[in-house]
């Protein structure tokens, strides 16, 4: 931000006279300054003082100097100023909108202490601080004030955030407090925010932080939640004073702080999120700054000083000029002022989110603003100052903007159309469309206000080329979709968005009504269409007619004018609307009827008075009449009855007008008497209902007001006596009977005997009613009444009287009914027949006269035929067996299917004449197959063939003809027919006939005869494709002969003979055509060749002009030269391309050379300026003398080349001496050198090099050595010879290099000698450094050929101990390596040992490795899977090593699924108490208890092994640090479980211990947290079942089935635990991952449980003992006492306890004695083993081994 001083608004005084406060108005038009004299000065935006007024004290008695103004702020509408004073009051002055308006106080707010600061952030809300520490709010609307929050400290400063919805107050104790009216979703906290080190007199709230400063000369920036962001410390600056005031820019991106003679400016850097100080503005003698005010648009900053001065500064980051028409002033990163340089108008463009404005463009005829930020898009209308900011992600600048609509900007990007309404910060809508053309999109945004509609925003656009979508942009939903049959090329909604006009590519204009979803085509050949602005009138052009729809609701009513031009536009203004028509070169205006236009607008706007006024100016026409009717309807709906009355008067509807006039008088009278709307009066409402013929509504309105008389009067006036009497009956009116009599008398007086009869009938007087009916001439009604009453039927005279009347009146059917009723069937039948009541006659005849039925059916059919009801007659004729009549009726009724059905039932003779008639019908419907079948049935096959022939269906006709005619006859017929067609010029039909009879050649001949070559070619291509090219060529030649060259061209080209075409045009002298064909059809150079020939035919200047025109002059010269036309080439180059002449000479020379004319060629080469080419020519021909002659005369530089060429010849002849001499003459010793090298004459090469090119001698020597190396053995010998030569010459270094170059190429002995010789020479004669290099080079090479000892000795000569050791190691000479390490450098002994170990490991020599590194050996055994050897070897090591590898082997076995082997491992080697092994022990235990087939006597040894291992582990744990740990306790539980399993297996081997085994299975259930719960319950249930404990078996097995279901479902949540309440069987157990019991055994259990549950004999209760608890539960539920488990059964020991030495171990005496007795009787070794284990586990057995007491 840069500050530039503009002007001084108020000059400073000599002494202290501080400006107390300043403020800018919200509209940027006014600036207020309050001076020390308490006077407010008002300035305009340009800095001119325009007004002033004095403030007043709270009480005049204290005088005008009794207070100071501490705060001042403009209202949001800029028409008021609030003044905060130290005499405890705030005044609000209304200053008005114009300068000079009277200043009046409109509000005042008295406070309890001095006002210290003040802000006016929102309408009606003033916020201010008091000296007592409170921050309060004054409401200008209610004239009341209230406290927002209070502190105990003086309020020194007050500021708001950028939006004005939050306030920040600074207090004398340094506290800064924040309060929000609306946090705008930021979620920031309220209340005390921070405690500043000093009173924050300078306080500003920017967008991203809070800036505070004061007397400590430090500026601190705080974050949104009060944490310190930055500190700017000026306390050490002797020039700086305290900071007195601060202000934030309107965008919140900059802050200015005032101190003494200085303004400090800070700018927020968004990318780094820090404040950065700009260069301070220092002004000498400005003194202390007391007030700052920033203009709302950010462009000006005003500064008030201690001496009363006010300075104005211009603020901006940068300025730019846009297209020399607009000035762009960036007053902040997020705020730009756009100024029109011509008009001076300004618009402030600002990002409300604080984003940096990156680029501003002015588009759309320089009216619309477009600007981008990183996250948003800014849009604006410069004319209306409406601005929008919407979220917008950058899309690479690919957006397209359309500004055709003044209310909305259309943005098109990546197939998506976005609409933004100017002035709205949300997108109006977004749709997908690929058609971004303003003519294919129509947006209407509140363009005409309508009655009852506040917001109307609609969009019409194309979804695809034939589908229009209409969207309500407010609701965001689709309100219509128009699918059209052809492409839409223009569309537009009317201004109200109710009608859509669109035109398709066929120039048809359609109108779509959105509410009714109806589409109407209103105009054809429409070239122009437009809605008249401000109305729903439509103007369109149809050819020479101008069409105008004044009332679009009646699209069939159109006004048309004849015009003689094209409509180019519409102009509306000055009270008239004109259609502009371009007639020739003049523009003619056709004026439309403004009244008709205005009428529609007035109607839509609901202004019916205006509409009436319009219509009264018009003459009555059909259009005007329609408008009056529309207005009358709308006026009635809106209850504007006077207007409706006027409408009906205009329409000539006098009755309605009079009725409305009376209604209006009633309404007016009510309005005068009672006030309000008279139309709400009940009589008015009832009369309006009567006007709409809604008499029931009128009745209801009357009766609601209890106006019964009025309701009855209404009906009487309308002569609606029935409704009148009904009202009287409903309300119990006393005049009811009188009404009825009056009604009857009125009926008789008006001769309404029928209605009177109905009245008498309803009252039950049948005779009177009949008499009246007969009098009225209604015998049918009399008959109906008689038929319903038996007593009247008995009156014979009456009945005869009625029947006579009926017959007289020819009401035969009714008479028949009466005769039938009185049982006179004969007369009834006659009457029915006369009255054509055949249905009743047939029904009666079936009962009374069956013989007559057939005749009646035929008569019925005849009657129906007379009535033209032929369809109905068919069935009656069928019933009457009149087939011919039925067929004719069916044919007459066009019931063809019925006719066919009836015909199929007739004999062939009868039917044959009718089939062709039906066939003709089907032929007319083009249902030829059915027609053919019918013709065939009617023996009219020829007609069928004719039918097919006339229909052009020759194939079917041919097929049919072949059936009934001989093939040759068919061919003759068709060919004859085809010839007739040919004569008539119907060639296509003739062709089809020829082709049908397989004679396409006749058709081809026909077309050729008539020169219809296209059709001829078509047929040839179809029937003789192999002859197509020949045909084209033949036709081409024919046409060429006839001079029809264009047609001939076509055929030549189709025959792929473009050259023939070119030749044809050349022969005819049509070079241009020939050139065209060659260019388009030939290859890349064909046209050039033709152009060349064309030019050659012209010759001279004409040829040059032509070739220049075609741009082919150079190409032609080249072509002529290339084709040996040198005369033409020289002619062209001479005339136009002189620079090409040497090139032509050159080509001519080359031509002559090829021809062998060397002397002429030499002359041409020299003319071409290419003597070197002549030299080369002679060299090529080995004419050395001529070559040298030309070179010396014309190209001295080539002399050397001639000599070189001659030398090359000498070399080829092996004349090396001559060649060398020539090369040296040519000063080319290098070439001589190369030739000797190529010839392998290295000695000569070295000689030449030494004499003439000594600088290359060394390189040549190296090359020679490389060459020798390549040659292998021969090369090696050369190296050795060379090395000896160098050695003899004392060149030891070179000799060494030669020796080193010797490679092992099959002769390793020689290589070794050479290398050793090199080493020997280097050690003897070369310096140490070189010596070292040689040895280090020779050593690896000796090792490479297996001479490790020799290499090691070399290394040892130079004390390279490690390299020597490495050589011995690589040679696997370990003893030598160890000896060298031991004797020369003991540090390498470990190095040798390590490599020896690695060697043994790599070689797999584990047995040898054991003696060196046993751990490595063991690891190698593990790697090789030799576990037995590994364990065997480890056994010989210490206990720790052994168990490391035992654990590894056990882990391997467990992974392989061999847990039993792992267990055996620990049985053999013991189970140490290593925590690392715990998981192994647990896994072995888990696998054992989960394994199948272990519930048997045979499994004893497995369980015993597990038991013994766990016992060993527990004994070891007691001695370890893990004693009594949770792991120890868990293993003790596992030991107990293993003991139970082992004891159970032992008991299962002895019959008498079955119950012991069962009890152990039951006892194991209390440990199901460690066991597979389903397996445990299954085993317990089966054991209980085996010993006859059915109750327990049922409960356990039922639980087992529940568990299997739970495993399938994957959850235990559904289990019922009620059976196991008050037991120690756990509920919370792990859910097994799989079933542990096979499917068959599960099904067996399921069947048993189902059987038992069906018997209902068992009680589902577990057995209980003397404790009242479950007998196997250790814990008594009632007492909580826990009993010890018996070592033999696991059951609780309640009495007869035998205790063992180890505490906690006991047995039940009975069980113990039983177990001992079983051992004694069975001598079971496994039981004895159990006893042995118990003795070991429990510290010995009880003293008495057997106890039977």
Swiss-Prot record:
Changing residue 257 to P: In RP71; represents a null allele. One of its GO terms (biological process) is intraciliary anterograde transport. The modification N-acetylmethionine is found at residue 1. The keyword Repeat applies. TPR repeats lie at residues 593-624, 692-725, 809-842, 854-887, 912-945, 947-970, 971-1004, 1042-1075, 1142-1175, 1276-1309, 1345-1378, 1411-1445, 1447-1477, 1574-1607. Its main location: other. The modification Omega-N-methylarginine is found at residue 672. There is a cross-link at residue 4 (Glycyl lysine isopeptide (Lys-Gly) (interchain with G-Cter in SUMO1)). One of its GO terms (cellular component) is sperm cytoplasmic droplet. PANTHER family: IFT140/172-RELATED, INTRAFLAGELLAR TRANSPORT PROTEIN 172 HOMOLOG. It is linked to Short-rib thoracic dysplasia 10 with or without polydactyly: A form of short-rib thoracic dysplasia, a group of autosomal recessive ciliopathies that are characterized by a constricted thoracic cage, short ribs, shortened tubular bones, and a 'trident' appearance of the acetabular roof. Polydactyly is variably present. Non-skeletal involvement can include cleft lip/palate as well as anomalies of major organs such as the brain, eye, heart, kidneys, liver, pancreas, intestines, and genitalia. Retinitis pigmentosa 71: A retinal dystrophy belonging to the group of pigmentary retinopathies. Retinitis pigmentosa is characterized by retinal pigment deposits visible on fundus examination and primary loss of rod photoreceptor cells followed by secondary loss of cone photoreceptors. Patients typically have night vision blindness and loss of midperipheral visual field. As their condition progresses, they lose their far peripheral visual field and eventually central vision as well. Interacts with IFT88. Interacts with IFT57. Interacts with RABL2/RABL2A; binds preferentially to GDP-bound RABL2. Required for the maintenance and formation of cilia. Plays an indirect role in hedgehog (Hh) signaling, cilia being required for all activity of the hedgehog pathway. This is Intraflagellar transport protein 172 homolog.
């Amino acid at each position: 931000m840069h500050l530039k001083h503009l002007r001084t608004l108020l000059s400073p005084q000599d002494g202290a006279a501080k400006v107390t406060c300043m403020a800018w108005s919200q509209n940027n038009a006014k600036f207020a300054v309050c001076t020390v004299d308490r006077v407010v000065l008002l300035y305009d935006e340009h800095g001119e003082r325009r007004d002033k007024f004095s403030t007043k004290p709270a009480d005049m008695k204290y005088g005008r100097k009794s207070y100071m103004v501490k705060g001042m702020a403009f209202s949001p509408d800029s028409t008021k100023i609030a003044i905060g004073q130290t005499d405890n009051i705030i005044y609000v002055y209304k200053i008005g909108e114009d300068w000079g308006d009277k200043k009046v106080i409109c509000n005042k707010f008295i406070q309890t202490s001095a006002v210290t600061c003040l802000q006016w952030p929102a309408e009606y809300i003033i916020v201010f601080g008091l000296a007592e520490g409170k921050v309060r709010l004054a409401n200008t609307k209610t004239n009341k004030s209230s406290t927002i929050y209070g502190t105990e400290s003086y309020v020194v400063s007050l500021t708001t955030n950028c939006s004005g919805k939050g306030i920040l107050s600074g207090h004398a104790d340094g506290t800064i407090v924040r309060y929000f009216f609306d946090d705008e979703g930021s979620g920031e906290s309220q209340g005390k925010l921070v405690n500043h080190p000093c009173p924050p007199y300078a306080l500003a709230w920017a967008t991203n932080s809070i800036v505070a400063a004061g007397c400590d000369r430090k500026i601190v920036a705080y974050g949104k939640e009060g944490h310190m962001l930055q500190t700017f410390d000026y306390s050490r600056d002797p020039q700086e004073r305290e900071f007195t005031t601060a202000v934030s820019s309107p965008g919140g991106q900059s802050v200015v702080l005032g101190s003494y003679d200085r303004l400090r400016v800070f700018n927020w850097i968004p990318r780094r999120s820090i404040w950065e100080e700009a260069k301070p503005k220092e002004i000498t003698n400005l003194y202390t700054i007391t007030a700052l005010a920033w203009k709302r648009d950010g462009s000006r900053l005003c500064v008030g000083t201690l001496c009363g001065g006010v300075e104005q500064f211009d603020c901006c980051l940068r300025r730019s000029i846009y297209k020399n028409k607009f000035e762009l002033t960036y007053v902040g990163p997020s705020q730009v002022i756009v100024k029109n340089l011509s008009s001076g108008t300004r618009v402030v463009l600002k990002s409300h989110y604080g984003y940096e404005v990156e680029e501003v463009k002015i588009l759309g005829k320089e009216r619309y603003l477009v600007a981008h930020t990183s996250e948003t898009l800014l849009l604006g209308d410069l004319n209306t100052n409406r601005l929008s900011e919407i979220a917008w992600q950058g899309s690479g600048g690919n957006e397209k903007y359309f500004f055709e609509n003044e209310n909305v900007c259309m943005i098109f990007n990546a197939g998506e159309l976005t609409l933004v309404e100017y002035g709205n910060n949300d997108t109006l809508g977004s749709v997908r469309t690929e058609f971004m053309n303003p003519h294919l999109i129509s947006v209407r945004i509140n363009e005409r206000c309508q009655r009852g509609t506040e917001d109307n925003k609609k969009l019409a656009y194309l979804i695809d080329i034939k589908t229009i979508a209409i969207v309500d942009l407010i609701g965001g939903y689709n309100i219509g979709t128009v699918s059209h049959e052809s492409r839409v090329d223009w569309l537009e909604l009317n201004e109200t968005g109710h009608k859509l006009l669109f035109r398709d590519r066929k120039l048809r204009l359609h109108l779509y009504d959105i509410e009714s979803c109806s589409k109407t085509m209103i105009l054809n050949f429409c070239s122009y269409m437009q809605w008249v602005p401000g109305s729903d009138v439509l103007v369109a052009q149809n050819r020479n007619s101008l069409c105008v729809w004044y009332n679009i609701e009646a699209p069939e009513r159109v006004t048309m004018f004849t015009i003689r031009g094209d409509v180019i536009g519409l102009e509306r203004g000055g009270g008239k609307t004109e259609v502009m028509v371009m007639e020739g070169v003049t523009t003619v205006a056709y004026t439309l009827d403004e009244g008709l236009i205005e009428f529609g607008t007035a109607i839509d706007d609901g202004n019916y008075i205006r509409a009436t006024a319009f219509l009264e100016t018009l003459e009555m026409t059909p259009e005007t009449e329609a408008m009056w009717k529309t207005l009358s309807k709308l006026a009635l709906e809106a209850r504007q009855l006077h207007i409706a009355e006027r409408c009906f008067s205009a329409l000539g509807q006098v009755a309605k007008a009079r009725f409305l006039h009376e209604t209006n008088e009633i309404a007016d009278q009510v309005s005068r008497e009672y006030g309000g709307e008279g139309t709400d009066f009940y009589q008015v409402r009832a009369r309006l209902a009567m006007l709409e013929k809604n008499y029931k509504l009128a009745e209801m309105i009357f009766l609601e007001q209890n106006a019964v008389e009025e309701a009855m009067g209404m009906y009487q006036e309308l002569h609606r006596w029935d409704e009148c009497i009904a009202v009287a009956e409903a309300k119990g009116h006393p005049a009811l009977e009188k009404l009825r009599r009056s009604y009857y008398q009125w009926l008789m007086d008006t001769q309404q005997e029928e209605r009177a009869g109905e009245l008498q009938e309803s009252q039950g007087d049948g005779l009177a009613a009949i008499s009246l009916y007969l009098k009225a001439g209604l015998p049918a009604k009399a008959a109906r009444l008689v038929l319903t009453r038996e007593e009247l039927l008995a009156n014979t005279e009456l009945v005869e009287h009625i029947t006579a009347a009926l017959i007289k009146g020819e009401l035969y059917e009714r008479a028949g009914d009466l005769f039938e009723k009185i049982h006179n069937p004969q007369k009834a039948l006659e009457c029915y027949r006369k009255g054509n009541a055949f249905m009743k006659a047939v029904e009666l005849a079936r009962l009374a006269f069956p013989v007559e039925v057939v005749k009646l059916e035929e008569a019925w059919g005849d009657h129906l035929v007379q009535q033209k009801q032929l369809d109905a007659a068919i069935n009656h004729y069928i019933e009457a067996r009149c087939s011919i009549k039925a067929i004719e009726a069916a044919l007459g009724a066009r019931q063809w299917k019925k006719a066919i059905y009836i015909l199929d039932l007739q004999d062939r003779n009868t039917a044959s004449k009718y089939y062709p008639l039906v066939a003709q019908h089907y032929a007319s419907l083009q249902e030829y197959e059915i027609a053919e079948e019918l013709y065939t049935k009617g023996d009219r096959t020829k007609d069928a063939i004719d039918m097919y022939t006339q229909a052009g269906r020759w194939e079917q006709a041919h097929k049919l003809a072949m059936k009934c005619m001989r093939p040759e006859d068919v061919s003759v017929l068709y060919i004859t027919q085809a010839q007739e067609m040919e004569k008539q010029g119907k060639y296509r039909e003739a062709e089809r006939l020829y082709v049908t009879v397989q004679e396409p050649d006749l058709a081809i001949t026909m077309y050729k005869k008539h020169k219809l070559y296209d059709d001829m070619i078509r047929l040839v291509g179809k029937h003789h494709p192999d002859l197509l090219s020949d045909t084209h060529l033949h036709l081409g030649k024919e046409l060429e002969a006839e001079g029809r060259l264009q047609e001939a061209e076509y055929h030549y080209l189709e025959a792929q003979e473009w050259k023939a075409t070119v030749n044809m045009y050349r022969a005819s002298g049509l070079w241009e055509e020939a050139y065209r064909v060659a260019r388009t059809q030939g290859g890349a150079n064909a046209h050039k060749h033709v152009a060349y020939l064309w030019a050659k035919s012209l010759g001279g200047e004409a040829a040059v002009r032509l070739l220049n025109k075609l741009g082919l002059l150079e190409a032609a010269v080249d072509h002529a030269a290339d084709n040996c036309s040198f005369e033409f080439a020289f002619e062209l180059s001479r005339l136009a391309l002189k620079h090409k002449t040497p090139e032509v000479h050159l080509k001519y020379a080359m031509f002559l050379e090829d021809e062998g004319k060397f002397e002429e060629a030499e002359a041409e080469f020299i003319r071409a300026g290419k003597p070197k080419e002549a030299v080369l020519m002679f060299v090529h021909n080995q004419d050395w003398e001529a070559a040298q002659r030309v070179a010396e005369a014309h190209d001295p530089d080539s002399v050397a080349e001639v000599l070189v060429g001659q030398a090359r010849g000498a070399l080829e002849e092996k004349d090396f001496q001559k060649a060398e001499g020539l090369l040296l003459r040519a000063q080319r010793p290098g070439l001589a050198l190369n030739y000797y090298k190529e010839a392998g004459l290295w000695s000569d090469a070295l000689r030449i090099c030494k004499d003439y090119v000594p600088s290359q001698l060394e390189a040549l020597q190296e090359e020679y050595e490389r060459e020798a190396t390549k040659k292998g053995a021969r090369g090696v010998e050369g190296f050795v010879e060379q090395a000896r030569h160098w050695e003899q010459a004392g060149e030891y270094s070179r000799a060494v290099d030669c020796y080193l170059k010797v490679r092992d190429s099959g002769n390793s002995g020689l290589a070794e000698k050479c290398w050793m010789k090199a080493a020997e020479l280097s050690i003897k004669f070369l310096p140490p450094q070189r010596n070292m290099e040689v040895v280090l080079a020779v050593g690896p090479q000796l090792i490479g050929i297996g001479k490790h000892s020799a290499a090691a000795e070399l290394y040892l000569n130079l004390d390279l101990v490690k390299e020597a050791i490495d050589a011995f190691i690589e040679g696997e000479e370990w003893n030598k390596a160890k000896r060298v390490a031991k004797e020369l450098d003991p540090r390498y002994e470990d190095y040798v040992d390590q490599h020896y170990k690695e060697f043994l490991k790599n070689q797999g020599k584990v047995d040898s490795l054991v003696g060196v590194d046993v751990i490595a050996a063991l690891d190698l055994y593990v790697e090789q899977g030799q576990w037995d050897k590994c364990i065997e070897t480890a056994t010989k090591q210490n206990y720790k090593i052994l168990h490391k590898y035992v654990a590894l082997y056990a882990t391997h076995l467990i992974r392989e699924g061999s847990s039993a082997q792992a267990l055996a491992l620990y049985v053999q080697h013991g189970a140490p108490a290593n925590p690392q092994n715990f998981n192994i022990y647990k896994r072995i235990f888990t696998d054992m208890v989960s394994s199948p087939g272990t519930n048997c006597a045979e499994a004893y040894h497995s369980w015993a092994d597990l038991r013994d291992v766990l016992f060993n582990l527990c004994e070891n744990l007691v001695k370890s640090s893990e004693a009594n740990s949770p792991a120890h306790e868990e293993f003790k539980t596992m030991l107990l479980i293993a003991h139970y399993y082992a004891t159970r297996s032992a008991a299962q081997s002895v019959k008498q211990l079955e119950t012991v085994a069962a009890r152990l299975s039951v006892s194991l259930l209390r440990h199901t947290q460690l066991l597979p719960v389903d397996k445990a319950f299954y085993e317990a249930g089966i054991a209980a079942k085996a010993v006859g404990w059915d109750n327990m078996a049922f409960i356990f097995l039922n639980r087992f089935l529940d568990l299997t279901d739970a495993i399938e479902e994957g959850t235990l949540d559904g289990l019922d635990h009620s059976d196991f309440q008050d037991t120690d069987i756990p509920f919370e157990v792990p859910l097994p991952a799989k079933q542990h019991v096979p499917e068959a055994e599960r099904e067996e259990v399921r069947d048993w449980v189902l059987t038992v549950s069906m018997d209902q004999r068992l009680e589902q209760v577990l057995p209980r003992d003397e404790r009242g608890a479950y007998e196997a539960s250790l814990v008594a539920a009632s007492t909580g006492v826990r009993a010890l488990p018996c070592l033999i059964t696991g059951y609780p020991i309640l009495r007869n306890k035998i205790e063992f030495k180890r505490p906690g171990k006991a047995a039940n005496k009975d069980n113990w004695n039983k177990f001992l007795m079983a051992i004694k009787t069975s001598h079971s070794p496994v039981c004895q083993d159990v006893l042995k284990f118990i003795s070991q586990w429990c510290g010995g057995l009880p003293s008495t081994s057997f106890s039977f007491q």
